[in-house]
Amino acid sequence: MVTRTRPVAAMAVRSRSSSRTGTAYLLLVLCEVSWAQIFSFPFRRPETCDFNQYFDISALSCAPCGANQRRDALGTSCVCLPGYHMISNNGGPSIICKKCPENMKGVTKDGWDCISCPSGLTAEGKCHCPTGHILVERNVSGSLLAQATCELCDESENSFTKANALGTRCVRCEPTFVNTSRSCSCSEPHTLTGGLCFSNTGNFHQRVISTARYGELGMSLNSEWFAKYLQATAAACWTHANLTSCQALGNMCVMNMNSYDSTTLDACRLFHYIFESTAGLISVHSVPFWRQNLPWLFYGDQPGLAPQVLSTTPLPTNFSFKGQNQLKFVAASYDIRGNFIKWQPLEGGVLQLCPDTERRLDAAYAFGTTYQQNCEISLSKLLVDFSSPVFYDVYLEYTDEEQHRYLWPIPVLNLNLQHNKLFVNQDSSSSKWLLTRRIFLVDAVSGRENDLGNQPRVIRVATQISLSIRLVPNTKNGNIYTPLLTIAYSDIDIKNAHSQSAKISFSVKYEMNQGDASVHTDIALGVLGGLAVLSSLLKTAGWKRRVGSPMIDLQTVMKFLLYYAGDLANVFFIITVGTGLYWLIFFKAQKSVSVLLPMPVQEERFVTYVGCAFAMKALQFLHKFISQISIDIFFIDWERPKGKVLKAVEGEGGVRSATVPVSIWRTYFVANEWNEIQTVRKINPLFQVLTTLFFLEVVGFKNLALMDSSSSLSRNPSDYTAPYSRILRYAVATAIWLVIGIIQVVFFAAFYERFIEDKIRQFVDLCSMSNVSVFLLSHRCFGYYIHGRSVHGHADTNMEEMNMNLKREAENLCSQRGLVPNTDGQTFQIAVSSQMRQHYDRIHETLTRRNGPARLLSSSGSTFEQSIKAYHAMNKFLGSFIDHVHKEMDYFIKDKLLLERILGMEFMEPMEKSIFYNDEGHSFSSVLYYGNEATLLIFDLLFFCVVDLACQDFVLASFLTYLQQEIFRFIRNTVGQKNLATKTLVDERFLI
């Protein structure tokens, strides 16, 4: 029966359970009970529980203790009240207490039994014994005595024992008591200090200064730690050569910043006294500054010793950028009492107060990686994490050829060290430095007054730690000198530890002697600068000939300076690009280290060169920019009226006949095309900027500018990112910019102009088809001529005749387009005579007497007619000049000499006749953007680099570079258009 009913009962239980679950769920849904109300509970701390409550670590709340119980010292369990002993204890609060009988009111130390006490009870209900006695509750076999006894420890010479601090057993007296007084007491004439007993007959210093000095705050305070332990520690070190005491004395000296004052008997003075007094002892590991039994704190105070330590002996090992390149720094660590803690590697952030991932912290010791870490830490955290300072002696571990492991000590430059009240380590001359050995990170002990349990009044923090690694000059195998650990401490007067903080920095920097590089740069600058002077003189001489001025005046000097600025800009550009690429290639590609990057301070000279290059290139750009928007230009219309076609014109004398005028639309069309090609370039500026930005930011070429040994373009986000080198950023940016620019120019010249569109040659062809020539004067007596005279005689014709003319020209059924018969030369450089220029100016003055082009509807008739007359006069004069009509202002055509082409100047002066030089290279583009692409490309590049050097942001540099390109292009178009309208009488409203 039982077995049959079990399934039914189980089903009933499951049914009732399901019903209850469904009901509960339905109630939750219908009542919309808040989950926050279900899962929230009161917040309790152990210290908030009552005297008879304990903190339940499971329920995280206060719970009552049992009868005759109270909470323990931790607050997480219960103990019996005084006068009660335990009869059951299952752990935690699960205890049962029972009252002791009247004749046995005391409770044993373990709390399980009651006992009769010989001399009173403590507040906890335990037996109490007088000073020097120990409490005995059990016999030798462990049986509980009926009454406890207080036994006096035997202090006689046979035992030398006394009660321990807990009063539970007799222990041997402290050795200094026994050795000094042959007893367990230290009375006159002996001295008791720091729990040790010393004899006055040792003639050791008695007036020890326990003051802790804080130079940054300009204050001193009486350190409880020094007052309590300094004299005892020094005496134990001096008298007994106690190793731990000597280490503790050294720690106290380090806590006082290794400062030494011959007039003050402080920790360092005591250490020096002991060091000098033990000169007869042997040196440790043959190091003259490391005396037996003493810690190695100083390298000595001889002048000039620091440079010998740092720059005389290279480390007997090599370093490379490939393979295992970690610097193995290790430290011997000691606690404040002088106990040796352990050997520990510096990996894991031992000396780095700023928190970070272990991977990033360990990157500080990757050889060749410049490391920089900064943070701000609250004083409350420092007080918790560094309640007691830890002291470190730092070494570099290396192996010899036989794989034997050795240690190389790392000297310390403590910037807070004072020698006879002088901060010698802050001097710029290393010969005055005093190197030390031991460091700590945080000292929150020496700043405590009166009681070591109090919060310190002052805390001393190592806020700046810098590890400097210097490469041996001319090394090929990665040899380095002894690294230098520079440390600076900040003294902080604690007001509110929770609101105060300390700014911490940790850095590793690499350096090498940059003297040779500076000399080579100076030589290159001197040689190229001299060549720039010669080039500028030649350009100035060529300019003087082109303006027809034989005198050297202020304008000549200013012109020379402008040319020199441009040439010197190229010199600085070449030097900076060469220098940048040198560091980029040789630093990143080396395996065995032979060069290291210049430090940020050493980069200032390079940045100055870049700034000079940009400033002078900007001056050259503005010079050319202004020259282009102020050129003299005129369109010569060769078109003549066809036959004697007449038309009726109404005048004052009635209706009369007149010749049909030549259409002006061809001239307007040519003027518009000229206006369009003024800012045509051989590259696409937007493509240039975006492509450069793409390679730098997206592909990751900017990672080559990081100051580490890696040449990878992609970096793991979890890895440490080294700071950027400004030299490498400049090198990478210039290399990418120039490569993209050169590729664009080559593509434009070799493909685009040849197969798609060549706007410069198209303009020359347009002039021929329009029967319009272009006369340009970029200087007073020098300019360019584009011969556009139609070989068909007329260009103002219909479509049929135009196509017929093109067909005849394609089939060579007409003469060639050149100025000289049977030639194709249409473009010329021209050097005009002064007489011709004067005649041009007389006509031009009439042409430009008005402030602007004629406003067709609003200008007065007389002004308009004068302009028309001047226009026709100029057109007639230039046309007749080209046709050799004026024998007194004639010209001849010749080829330029090779040397003239190379130097960019003319040897012959146009004295009586003007000179037309054949120009197949269309050099008239020099008055356009097109012919100054190199200047524009370098100016844009330098602008890009200067912005990046200032902001360290390629995106911002790209945006501002494109913005300035567009601004100058707009100004060039606008002002150039106005100049074109003014010089050619083409109404600006028709320039679209």
From Swiss-Prot:
InterPro entries: Growth_fac_rcpt_cys_sf, Meckelin. GO terms for biological process: branching morphogenesis of an epithelial tube; cilium assembly; determination of left/right symmetry; epithelial tube branching involved in lung morphogenesis; heart development; kidney development; negative regulation of centrosome duplication; non-canonical Wnt signaling pathway. One of its GO terms (cellular component) is cytoplasmic vesicle membrane. It is found in: Cell membrane; Endoplasmic reticulum membrane; Cytoplasm, Cytoskeleton, Cilium basal body. The keyword Transmembrane helix applies. PANTHER family: MECKELIN. It is linked to A spontaneous deletion of TMEM67 cause the bilateral polycystic kidneys (bpck) phenotype, a disease mimicking human Meckel-Gruber syndrome 3. Homozygous bpck/bpck mice typically manifest bilateral nephropathy with swollen abdomens resulting from grossly enlarged polycystic kidneys and die by 3 week of age. Some mice also develop hydrocephalus, usually detectable within a few days of birth. Additionally, bpck/bpck mice exhibit retinal degeneration and tissue disorganization in the eye, and cochlear defects. This is Meckelin. It comes from Mus musculus (Mouse).
